[in-house]
């Protein structure tokens, strides 16, 4: 989309539920009428529309999200895909179809047929060539791809996110903000990397680069955990695993020790993910991630103490799921690997008591049934 002319740049500040999520910065291609409509709806400068609502994206939501396709918003009148209004009136014609839907993060007009453009738009998350000739591409995301991915991967019901994805602020970028709009900036932990490897910019990814990035993400996760931000810590550990998954095995030109380093890091990230998932009461995930850690423990040459932690973490998850018998089995394995560990000993006592209490309750119920 190279063009010598200075293109408008706009932004959305996104909130998911009550959580501030981040900024999406967009650059508008010179499809003049379509781009001007979108720019003005970002600033709200046109005032009230014919439907009695402000011609402004602020406060509107992304009402339709389909993973591996797109995220859609812009209905600031009905909030459900049936409304919206352009600055020219309710609808305006398709301007041109010169730009193709050939990559993710393109900005395109939603419509209900030829010549029905209003205010609704979508951002692609994959190439969507079947939309060529039907929808007008008029911009692209230049920053905040991780925010788009976060929205794309939300839980939905009938394609609507279960939590509102709200544009809490929006507008046009000018001056230094314009110049800085496409610059990657680290988040609060210092993490400068895109959430998904497919969106990575900079040095080409290979096994060594992915190991380096995943190692840094583990450190960012540890720092978030120590600061008390468990959800962010878990997010960084899982992000690290995504980067490792890009190149699960080194190639023949990589250093020989890299294979063992990757396996050890994968074990640690799974085990740490289990720890934080349990603390967040995500016991199903906690058990799964501890199991993944244990599945890789021998290949990773994990120490007995670290394997004991993984068994312990899976036991805590099983206890949280009220599956105390499974928890006890894992705790007994952990005790073999780390005899005398006070945490394991205490958890065994706790689980045995839970089993005893459950059995007593079952006996009482049976006696009442047969009396």
Curated annotation (Swiss-Prot):
Residues 175-195 are annotated as: Disordered. Keywords: Cytoplasm, Isomerase, Repeat, Rotamase, TPR repeat. PROSITE patterns: CSA_PPIASE_1, CSA_PPIASE_2, TPR, TPR_REGION. TPR repeats lie at residues 214-247, 267-300, 308-341. Its EC number is 5.2.1.8. One of its GO terms (biological process) is protein refolding. It is an enzyme of class 5 (isomerase). Residues 11-172 form the PPIase cyclophilin-type domain. It comes from the Eukaryota. GO terms for cellular component: cytoplasm; intracellular membrane-bounded organelle. It is found in: Cytoplasm. GO terms for molecular function: cyclosporin A binding; peptidyl-prolyl cis-trans isomerase activity; ribosome binding; unfolded protein binding. SUPFAM superfamilies: Cyclophilin-like, TPR-like. It catalyses: [protein]-peptidylproline (omega=180) = [protein]-peptidylproline (omega=0). PPIases accelerate the folding of proteins. It catalyzes the cis-trans isomerization of proline imidic peptide bonds in oligopeptides. Belongs to the cyclophilin-type PPIase family. PPIase D subfamily. This is Peptidyl-prolyl cis-trans isomerase D. It comes from Aspergillus oryzae (strain ATCC 42149 / RIB 40) (Yellow koji mold). The lineage of its organism: Eukaryota, Fungi, Dikarya, Ascomycota, Pezizomycotina. The gene is cpr6.
């Amino acid at each position: 989309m190279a063009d010598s002319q200075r293109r408008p740049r706009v932004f959305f500040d996104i909130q998911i539920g009550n959580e501030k999520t981040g900024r999406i910065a967009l650059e508008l291609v010179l499809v003049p009428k379509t781009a001007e409509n979108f720019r003005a709806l970002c600033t709200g400068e046109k005032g009230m529309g014919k439907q009695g609502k402000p011609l402004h994206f602020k406060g509107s939501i992304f009402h339709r999200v389909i993973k591996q396709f797109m995220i859609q918003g812009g209905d600031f009148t009905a909030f459900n895909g049936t409304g919206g209004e352009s600055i020219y009136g309710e609808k305006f014609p398709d301007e041109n179809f010169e730009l193709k839907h050939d990559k993710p993060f393109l900005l395109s007009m939603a419509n209900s047929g030829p010549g029905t453009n209003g205010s609704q738009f979508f951002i692609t998350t994959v190439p969507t060539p079947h939309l060529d000739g039907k929808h007008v591409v008029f911009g692209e995301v230049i920053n905040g791809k991780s925010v788009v991915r976060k929205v794309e991967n939300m839980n939905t019901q009938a394609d609507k996110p279960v939590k509102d994805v709200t544009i809490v602020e929006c507008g046009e970028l000018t001056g230094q903000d314009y110049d800085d709009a496409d610059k990657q900036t680290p988040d609060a932990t210092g993490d400068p990397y895109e959430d998904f490897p497919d969106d990575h910019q900079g040095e080409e990814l290979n096994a060594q680069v992915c190991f380096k990035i995943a190692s840094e993400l583990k450190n960012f996760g540890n720092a978030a955990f120590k600061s008390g931000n468990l959800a962010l810590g878990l997010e960084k550990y899982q992000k690290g695993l995504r980067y490792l998954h890009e190149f699960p095995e080194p190639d023949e030109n990589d250093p020989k020790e890299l294979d063992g380093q990757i396996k050890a890091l994968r074990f640690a990230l799974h085990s740490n993910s289990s720890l934080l998932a349990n603390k967040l009461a995500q016991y199903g995930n906690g058990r799964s991630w501890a199991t993944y850690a244990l599945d890789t423990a021998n290949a990773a040459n994990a120490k007995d103490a670290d394997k004991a932690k993984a068994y312990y973490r899976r036991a805590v998850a099983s206890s949280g799921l009220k599956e105390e018998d499974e928890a006890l089995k894992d705790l007994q394995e952990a005790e073999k690997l780390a005899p005398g560990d006070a945490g394991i000993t205490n958890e065994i006592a706790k689980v045995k008591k839970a089993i005893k209490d459950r059995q007593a309750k079952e006996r009482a119920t049976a006696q009442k049934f047969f009396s």
